[in-house]
Design a protein with these regions (language model features):
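Conserved helicase motor core of SF1/SF2 NTP-dependent helicases
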Residues: 1-252
Length: 252
């Protein structure tokens, strides 16, 4: 058996009693994040994410067992007049909006400006420099309403979709729009919006730079269970591991 139970499973509309709906890997691992040596082999090296991105993913979802291959740091972005704090790693843009549920025009405007900027910049892969194209930027949102609005705002050929669409894919740059203003406005609740597997997949699509647009109030979301405590804690850890910039300080 080969797989990653820390990412999204196959969707199913069927209800199973007890644990009978678990995948084989989930059933074997139980509460464990990674497979122990006596049960299998954990592939501990990523050839996608630069070493600035991997620590958050590794510590949050893989028991700190995941490391970046040296080849990943041979990919870089050449950004002139960069409006962000860094050229690589995880950048968290703190947004300020209210009453947004399935769409956020504020986040769409920022995404459009970042997208236009990146299309004027360069990507370097093992010493070979080229222009950044639409294929080099993934834009991810939790809700189809936001996805559709972003697609209409960006140039034709943009790679915009939900997390489910992009699992298994990669790009030098990823931009995640969290969309909802707070937990109360999140249509499917924080169990969906802040889901561990979705966060893992969204951030880990990036080879060089992962950008997260998130409203400040989501860090203060009210929790009602131990599971929700874990979800909130992941985002607090994300903030700690990111370069944080307030949206009004972006020079776009």
């Amino acid at each position: 058996m080969i797989g990653d139970p820390r990412q999204l499973g196959n969707p199913s509309d069927i209800t199973h009693p007890g644990d009978s709906g678990l995948s084989v890997l989930d059933f074997i691992l139980g509460e464990k994040n990674t497979v122990p040596p006596n049960l299998g082999i954990f592939l501990s090296t990523t050839r996608r994410m630069r070493s600035e991105i991997t620590p958050f993913i590794s510590e949050s979802f893989y028991d700190s067992r995941l490391n970046s291959h040296p080849i990943t740091d041979k990919r870089s972005l050449k950004l002139e007049g960069n409006p962000l704090p860094h050229h690589s790693g995880i950048v968290l843009v703190e947004m300020e909006h209210q009453d947004n549920a399935q769409s956020s025009k504020e986040e769409i405007e920022v995404i459009a400006k970042l997208y236009s900027y990146f299309l004027t910049q360069k990507f370097i892969d093992e010493g070979i420099e080229r222009d950044i194209s639409a294929d080099d930027i993934l834009v991810v949102a939790p809700y189809n309403v936001q996805v559709n609005l972003i697609q209409k705002k960006l140039p034709e050929g943009n790679r915009t979709g939900t997390v489910d669409k992009f699992q298994g894919q990669e790009a030098p740059i990823s931009i995640l729009s969290m969309t909802s203003s707070d937990g109360d406005n999140a249509p499917r609740g924080i169990n969906f919006l802040m889901d561990e597997a979705r966060l893992n997949v969204a951030v880990s699509r990036a080879q060089c730079l992962s950008i997260i647009l998130i409203n400040k109030e989501l860090f203060n979301v009210h929790i009602n269970s131990i599971n929700q405590f874990k979800l909130k804690n992941n985002f607090l850890k994300l903030k700690q591991k990111s370069s944080v910039i307030e949206v009004n300080k972006l020079n776009l």
